Amino acid sequence: KFKKNLKKKNLSVLKTREPGGSKSAETIRNLIFSKTSSTFHKKTDYYLMLASRNEHLINTLLPAKKKKLIVISDRFTDSTYAYQVSGNNIDSKVNSVNKNYILNSFRPDLTIVLKSSLKMINSRLKKRKQLNKFDKLKNSFFIKVQNVFIKLAKNNKKKYFLIDTSVNNNSAEKKILEVISKKLKI
């Protein structure tokens, strides 16, 4: 929906996701979410996420930046920090080194954090046709991850924007468009 609304304003927009976002990154994504991946050690999972990000960056994000496209990505480095580093206790110093090694100076201009109630999260998960391994984690994990995102957002209000989606989904979408429009000065 955001892509469509931004295109109406004659903006060149690329929508992407992580893990995935390029042909090679999608191959890694398929491995991450395969049935056998539930037996992967947490470090293996972490490095697969980074491998996918590297492919995504090289094959999608950097070319998009060169073309001056507006990129909307469903998840990026903060998700790795929230899910793998904080959620699965991966060493944050190791993550910082790896993040800088892969991204170099590449960073998102804006991160929108969607806050939702546990009831809403579970309701959305029930509507999905197929659940992945992250969807099947305990509520305590979701709370921990969401708290990390909220803390990131509160600690850097210039880069992050926190939107409560548990109130009304339509108003959340409207607010997201307002935030993006303000950031892009359109």
Model regions and ranges:
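ATP-dependent small-molecule kinase phosphotransfer cores
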Residues: 11-103
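A short, Lys/Arg-enriched amphipathic alpha-helix followed by its capping loop at the start of a domain
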Residues: 1-11
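Hydrophobic/aromatic beta-strand patches that form the interior of the parallel beta-sheet core
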Residues: 16, 72, 110-112, 161-163
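A glycine- and Lys/Arg-enriched "phosphate-lid" helix/loop adjacent to the NTP-binding pocket
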Residues: 79-147
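Residues at the C-termini of beta-strands that transition into short coil/loop
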Residues: 17-19, 115, 166
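Generic detector of well-ordered alpha-helical packing
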Residues: 1, 46, 75-79, 110, ...
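NTP-dependent small-molecule kinase module
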Residues: 3-5, 119-186
